[in-house]
């Protein structure tokens, strides 16, 4: 078979450009352009279920918690708190008994998830001071509520040198109080590098079964099991922080009501 001539060899392309059909699958290891880590983590979030990998279809959590029935109900709490170094607490499982889409039918319901939206900010005088302040958030489940109001931050948590960043539940209260989620946000004051406010946007799946007594009012004192509390405290001793939050809980009524 005759060989190719020299001019044919030169005119023949060395390599052909192939088009890769890669649909951003998380299972392929490739040298891609640097992207934001959060975008890569949520790459399959907004796609239909049939277009997601089998891992997302097999291990999908049920829409309705076990022992509950629909529809999914929503309760919102709008509040503005003065977060101090000693801490504040809010009960986020207060639901009135009734027949509406924001009410509980009976004594028992399950809070499937919670959505915390808002910001922490400083006023005009505090933000001019050169300091850094962090707000610690503790989403706590009170398994055996007692009294007319929740216990204070210092009564529940044990801290070293009264520092909220080292807060842990006291040993004698560990069977009653359970920290389900913990997060923080940072604000910075001063003439340079100032960050006077910090946005909050957190969504947690908790699946907490709350039990009330025979009363209809949405109060902490009417809880008998699993009250959901949000503790907040700032790390700076002299400069408080303001928290403007909108908290939404998504819950289902229990079948045994």
UniProtKB/Swiss-Prot annotation:
Keyword Translocase: no
Protein name: Capsid protein
Keywords: Capsid protein, T=1 icosahedral capsid protein, Viral penetration into host nucleus, Virion, Virus entry into host cell
Gene3D superfamilies linked to this entry: 2.60.120.20
GO CC annotations on file: host cell; T=1 icosahedral viral capsid
UniProt function note: Encapsidates the viral DNA into characteristic twinned ('geminate') particles. Plays a role in protection of the genome from degradation, virus acquisition and transmission by insect vectors, infectivity, and systemic movement.
A GO term for molecular function: structural molecule activity
Location of the protein in the cell: Virion
Pfam families registered for this protein in UniProt: Gemini_coat
Organism: Tomato yellow leaf curl Sardinia virus
Record field: transmembrane: none
GO biological process assignments: symbiont entry into host cell; viral penetration into host nucleus
Family that this chain belongs to: Belongs to the geminiviridae capsid protein family.
Entries under InterPro entries matching the protein: Gem_coat_AR1, GV_A/BR1_coat, Viral_coat
Keyword Ubl conjugation recorded: no
